[in-house]
UniProtKB/Swiss-Prot annotation:
Protein's gene: smyd5
Effect of loss of the gene: Morpholino knockdown results in embryos which show normal gross morphological development, including of heart and skeletal muscle. However, an increased expression of genes related to both primitive and definitive hematopoiesis is seen.
Classification of source organism: Eukaryota, Metazoa, Chordata, Craniata, Vertebrata
Tissue occurrence: Expressed at high levels in the ovary and at lower levels in the fin, testis and brain.
Domain SET: 20-351
This protein's name: Protein-lysine N-trimethyltransferase SMYD5
PROSITE patterns: SET
Alphabetic keyword roster: Cytoplasm, Metal-binding, Methyltransferase, S-adenosyl-L-methionine, Transferase, Zinc, Zinc-finger
Record's GO cellular component terms: cytoplasm
Any one GO BP annotation for this protein: negative regulation of myeloid cell differentiation
Residues involved in S-adenosyl-L-methionine binding: Y350
GO molecular function terms attached to this record: histone H3K36 trimethyltransferase activity; histone H4K20 methyltransferase activity; protein-lysine N-methyltransferase activity; zinc ion binding
EC number: 2.1.1.-, 2.1.1.372, 2.1.1.359
Length: 415
């Protein structure tokens, strides 16, 4: 059963404003639902701001000391601490330290398990939603605790670059176990798209690799031992657990936070004399070179979340909106990339900028493998006569002339 429209806006920072700006409509049986503008938007306008139903930092990311608030994923390192760790330069001093927005004096630990939060508000919010169930207390570092065994098993089958976390599933169960309004939360979670059994297997295969059947069984057993709930018994069956994995694998929205990135943006906004501006820009350029040499591409605290309203956005290779996290936490800002008129569908891209510039065939290959649909956006339709082969620099890796599955959907829904 799909969530009522009122529920669709329930996680927005200003739900009344959001419901006056956009509308979720059923399009057809192929595309499912979509998000539509109810008023005009200009380029750069914030369409809505939304918090996730649940979110979680990736497990390898946390293990490698990317310190983030357990609840909202706000980066906990100061910009200088972050820069020192990423660059491998422990004596590095950042100019303009006043531009760092991290406030260590506000950080709080759970008194039972010592998990860290960026504020008392986040600690209380986690406790109110799921942490009473998931708090390990003095067993936080016990490798034999069922939740720790579940996390270790997940890390053993899902390596960086990460795209999901089994703790999203754990928080879904813990939320329902802990809440008084169990029916409402179950309704919210079941709002996300459903798949056929074969499609679910493809998604799980993508997440867990060739031996996914055995790995999925192991994870289900550990998940059941750690979190079984009679009311949710269907979620713990082989079919139900596979469906949960499919839901998170298809609908999870990546979240990235960085205190250093926030500091750099604040530096860019400074009004400085020319010489000082050149010196600061040179310092930042060199810092990123040092970080690239030491750390590579892994700069952010990374995780994912389930966003109810944003999940209604369909994909386009020429999107008119994009999701970002400018507040250095899990609050998703959906922003217009161009002017959007009333009644126009609001689409995002499931591809990054580099992927969107690749050939139609390459784009379709990525979308098929990760989201199980064939795109029929304006750009793809205009390139229908292009040869069915990947870009020249991709041919050796991906092969030539792969045919598109006739049974694939024309459009993605609910991601």
């Amino acid at each position: 059963m799909a969530a009522p429209v009122d529920d669709m806006f329930s996680r927005c920072v200003d739900s009344a404003k959001a419901s006056n700006c956009v509308d979720v409509r059923f399009i057809n049986n192929v595309k499912g639902k979509g998000l539509f503008a109810k008023k005009p938007f200009k380029k750069g306008d914030t369409i809505f701001i939304e918090r996730p139903l649940v979110s979680s930092q990736f497990l390898w990311n946390a293990l490698y000391k990317y310190r983030a608030c357990e609840y909202c994923l706000r980066a906990l390192e100061t910009a200088e601490e972050n820069a020192r760790r990423l660059s491998g330069l422990p004596a590095l001093i950042l100019p303009h330290p006043e531009l760092c927005k991290v406030r260590p004096d506000r950080h709080q630990a759970c008194p039972q398990c010592q998990v860290m939060y960026c504020s008392s508000e986040c600690r209380q919010a986690a406790m109110d939603q799921y942490h009473k169930i998931l708090c390990l207390g003095p067993s936080n570092d016990d490798p034999d605790h069922p939740v720790n065994k579940l996390q270790d098993a997940w890390r053993s089958v899902h390596f960086p670059p990460e795209t999901s976390s089994v703790m999203i599933l754990a928080k879904m169960v813990a939320t329902i176990k802990q809440t008084q309004d169990k029916e409402r939360w179950q309704r919210l979670f079941t709002n996300f798209c459903s798949r056929t059994a074969n499609e679910e297997e493809e998604i799980v295969h993508k997440l867990l690799g060739e031996k996914f059947q055995g790995q999925l069984g192991l994870l289900r057993n550990l998940f059941t031992t750690a979190l079984y709930e009679d009311r949710l018994s269907q979620w713990f069956t082989p079919e139900g657990f596979r469906s949960l994995f499919s839901l998170v694998g298809t609908n999870g929205q990546g979240i990235g936070t960085s205190s250093l990135s926030q500091w750099v943006h604040a530096c860019d906004a400074l009004e400085l004399p020319r010489q000082q501006r050149e010196q600061l820009d040179a310092f930042i350029d060199q810092l990123y070179k040092d970080i690239d040499k030491e750390t590579g591409d892994f700069l952010n605290c990374e995780g994912s979340g389930l966003f109810l309203l944003q999940s209604s956005c369909n994909h386009s290779c020429v999107p008119n909106a994009e999701a970002s996290f400018p507040e250095n936490n899990f609050l998703l800002h959906l922003t217009a990339l161009g002017d959007i008129g009333p009644g126009e569908e609001i689409c995002i891209s499931y591809l990054d900028c580099c992927q969107r510039d690749r050939s139609r065939h390459s784009r379709h290959k990525i979308l098929r493998e990760n989201y199980l649909f064939i795109c029929s956006c304006q750009k793809c339709l205009s390139q229908m006569d292009d040869a069915d082969m990947t870009s020249e620099d991709e041919e050796e890796v991906e092969g030539e002339g792969e045919t598109e599955g006739e049974d694939m959907e024309d459009e993605m829904t609910d991601v």
